[in-house]
Regions:
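Conserved catalytic cores of very large enzyme subunits
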Residues: 2-206, 237, 241-244, 248, ...
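Extended, non-transmembrane alpha-helical coiled-coils
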Residues: 218, 222-225, 229, 244
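A conserved hydrophobic secondary-structure block that centers on an alpha-helix together
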Residues: 230-237
Length: 803
């Protein structure tokens, strides 16, 4: 059996750098907030695109910078690594409300000094009614107020955050440099006829782009100067390194990159600044092994660099990637536990001419991720039927290390799904993962995952059973649709479900479109728009429809609970009549507490078929229920529809991240036997310990979902023990299982936690002994010890599969 030694070790300095990051306590940093406030105050009357550009300029010119003693790649997001900057133009409400509780959280803890509290309180009045959250809330129609007041539709992930779920055009950045963008913008700006009123906004957009390009150039130059100054007092080897850093930072990202080292520094500068400009998460690297490979090959062929040096730079990049952090509101942490940034790196897949895209750099990316063993980046391997078998084998070896990576996405499903929705074939073949399991065309996709409303299927089912009244809040959400206790048939219940889920889908669209309009007006992101095609050609930001493609996925939680609930009702109540409608309803209201209710619960759990066991009876029920949602969602375009991009439509997605825990807390007892306030099933995975027929049966159940319609991702988590994969024959079985799932069953995605239940329980009891234990939460990995106990318990409770 291979083990971590197979991939080699970090160099001493990278190992030291990694340990520093692991040991660093994350603090709240007010620096960015102060500089943003200063810029907004000084530019109150400027058009919003210029205000945003001048804000970024002020931050990049004045924020503190530093170069760590162990690093070869430079650039920092905050005043200290792993500290979280504040973005007041999005919201200050939760920041001020939670100033004294950040350190007291159950999970996602942040520390804060009294001086930082004072600084944040001093700027808060300026933002009182002057940021995205305030203006977005004011825009929300009264029609959706009941859903916002009761928390049925959360907005923490929308009104508090910026552009997300995308990858910019790194390939063009490296070939043209920002200088190439600058030259194009100057030309287009000079050609504008300002007598045409439509060109006034374009003129200001181009001005904003030029300001931001210059600001990025200045930021890099500051590091060039600092490295040169530090070289004066450094020993010989480090002096040479610092002088090389100085040379590179004087060149990129403004100039095109000429070698691998320049390219990786250029990419990092932009990846970093995108997350200084905006606090959107899931800002991803795209197809890293494809756009970086020409630089790698040239340097290797010319003897300019060695594989060991490349791996050290990759290790360095992933450690720097882990320094980026984000503080969320307490409410938001319930759906994004572990302070995830979801910065995805995609490797493998196919070229645009349909050949296997695996190259030597693909293997080195695997090796570096194995060496660093960090939750960032979020590594995805694109699988296809002709994937290099040695590469696939190495990916499984990385997975065995227990970081929950890589995840596997299936070209055989995703590419046709994109083409069906109007994506050009060459672009579809170039897709990458952009966060958890969501996918997009890098550099051409204006995707903003506003589906953070989380359509809670089990809670909606309870509304359909309760005559349109929400069981949790006791508020009426939809028009009367009948009481379950008086329904004459199962079909009557399904008709009520259809009515309710369609109404709530419409309401979610109203919420999301309103917030998107507010985002468009208040927080356009200039650098991000510059680097996504063809915002410059159209002179529009991403939010205005500047991207070539623009799609939004809705997110759903509790799919397995919905399936199991419907099956239990149909079989035990209507088909076999073992439980009366009143008995079931009373047991739900009682939360299965009384002896009679516990008897009902036992029947629901043990005598009804369960999703995840390849039983059509239950699997096809959830497909029918899902179809109502998908059919309704497709009716509603997003705010960029007919404004330039191809698409402008919505589709489904199951990337519920850790929302199954928070959503479960807000959901009463359900007909599958689940008790109130306990977690729902996550993604498209079966409910805990309900999948009794092994992993093949799970794959078959999941493959029956309308995968081609769930283009936003069909997230499937599986769990096996490290001991199981110690045998080579079991590893081969797992490889064949994944191939069958993708090739024959047309599965979308799968990822594995390779960790024992005993290890997780010990880590919960003795966190100091497991500081670098990483687990797969949902479509991302996180350090186990930073998760709340509820999320830890949810992961511990997942089924351990045999092979």
């Amino acid at each position: 059996m291979k083990n971590s030694a197979h991939f080699g070790s970090l160099t001493p300095r990278m190992d030291h750098f990694r340990e520093e990051i692991l040991d660093k306590k994350p603090y709240i940093d007010a620096t960015r907030a102060i500089l943003a406030t200063q810029a907004y105050k000084e530019n109150l009357n400027q058009p919003v695109v210029l205000k945003r550009a001048l804000m970024l300029k002020n931050i990049l010119e004045k924020m503190p910078i530093y170069i760590e003693e162990d690093t070869l790649i430079v650039g920092n997001q905050a005043s200290s690594n792993r500290d979280a900057p504040i973005f007041p133009e999005y919201t200050m409400k939760f920041v001020i409300d939670e100033l004294d509780t950040f350190e007291k959280r159950d999970g996602d803890v942040f520390y804060i000094t009294e001086k930082t509290k004072e600084d944040l309180r001093s700027i808060a009045p300026f933002w009182q009614n002057n940021n995205l959250r305030a203006k977005g809330e004011a825009l929300l129609p009264e029609e959706v107020s009941v859903f916002m007041e009761t928390g049925f539709f959360g907005m923490e992930g929308k009104l508090n955050a910026g552009d997300a779920h995308l990858s910019v055009n790194y390939q063009r950045l490296l070939s043209d440099g920002l200088k190439g963008y600058e030259e194009r913008v100057k030309k287009l700006k000079g050609e504008l006829d300002l007598c045409n009123p439509a060109n006034i906004d374009k003129y200001h957009f181009y001005r904003a782009v030029l300001i931001v390009i210059d600001a990025v150039k200045t930021f890099a130059s500051r590091f060039s100067k600092l490295a040169k100054e530090m070289s004066l007092n450094a020993e010989k080897k480090r002096r040479e390194e610092l002088l090389e850093i100085s040379r590179i930072c004087a060149k990129v990202p403004y100039e095109p990159a000429s070698n691998f080292y320049e390219a990786i520094q250029s990419v990092w500068f932009v990846q970093l600044i995108l997350q200084i400009e905006s606090n959107g998460h899931s800002v991803s690297y795209g197809r890293f092994d494809q756009y970086m490979y020409p630089f790698y090959k040239k340097d290797i062929d010319e003897g300019f660099i060695t594989d060991d040096e490349v791996v050290e730079l990759l290790d360095n990049l992933w450690i720097k990637t882990t320094t980026i952090n984000k503080v969320r509101s307490q409410a938001h942490t319930f759906s994004s536990a572990g302070s995830p940034m979801y910065q995805n790196v995609t490797i493998g897949g196919q070229t645009t001419d349909k050949k296997d895209a695996v190259n030597a750099l693909s293997f080195l990316v695997l090796k570096s991720v194995a060496q660093t063993r960090l939750p960032q980046p979020n590594l995805t391997v694109r699988y296809h039927k002709n994937l290099d078998p040695h590469f696939f084998d190495e990916a499984i070896e990385v997975m065995k290390l227990g970081t929950g990576m890589p995840a596997f996405n299936n070209d055989e499903v995703i590419i046709p799904s994109f083409i069906e929705k109007g994506v050009k074939e060459e672009d579809a073949y170039n897709y990458s993962a952009i966060g958890c399991v969501e996918t997009a065309v890098p550099g051409k996709w204006g995707y903003r995952c506003t589906g953070m409303s989380y359509m809670n299927f089990p809670r909606i089912l309870l509304i359909a059973m309760n005559n349109g009244v929400d069981m949790t809040s006791q508020k009426r959400f939809v028009e009367p649709c009948g009481y379950f206790t008086k329904m004459k048939s199962f079909d009557e219940l399904m008709n009520a479900w259809d009515k309710v889920v369609r109404k709530l889908t419409r309401m979610s669209v109203i919420v999301e479109n309103t917030i998107d309009l507010a985002s468009e007006r208040e927080v356009p992101d200039i650098l991000c728009s510059t680097l996504v095609e063809d915002c410059i050609g159209r002179a529009k930001t991403i939010k205005e429809g500047g991207a070539i493609y623009d799609f939004i996925s809705g997110l759903q939680t509790g799919i397995a609970n919905m399936a199991d609930s419907l099956a239990a009702i149909k079989k035990l109540v209507f088909d076999e009549k073992k439980i009366t409608q009143q008995e079931l309803w009373d047991a739900l209201i009682d939360n299965f507490e009384s002896p009679q209710s516990q008897r009902i619960q036992s029947m629901l759990i043990n005598e009804a078929p369960k999703y995840g066991n390849d039983i059509d009876y239950v699997d096809m029920l959830v497909v029918k229920a899902y179809d109502s949602y998908i059919d309704e969602m497709k009716k509603y375009p997003n705010t960029r529809y007919h404004r330039g991009p191809i698409g402008g439509i919505r589709y489904a997605g199951t990337s519920s991240i850790s929302a199954n825990v928070g959503q479960g807390y807000d959901t009463m007892a359900t007909p599958d036997g689940r008790k109130a306030h306990t977690p729902l099933a996550e993604g498209s995975s079966p409910a805990h310990n309900s999948d009794k027929n092994g992993p093949t049966a799970v794959f078959k159940s999941v493959s029956k979902l309308p995968t081609h319609e769930i283009t936003g991702g069909v997230l499937l988590n599986q769990k096996v023990t490290p001991q199981l994969l110690e045998k080579e024959e079991n590893k081969m079985k797992l490889e064949m299982l994944i191939k069958t799932f993708f090739n024959r069953l047309e599965g979308y995605h799968v990822q594995y936690n390779v960790v024992s239940k005993e290890t997780l329980i010990d880590a919960q009891k003795h966190p100091e002994k497991h500081k670098d234990l990483i687990v797969r939460v949902a479509g991302y990995s996180a350090f186990f010890n930073v998760l709340s106990k509820a999320t830890q318990d949810d992961i511990i409770g997942r089924t351990e599969q045999s092979l």
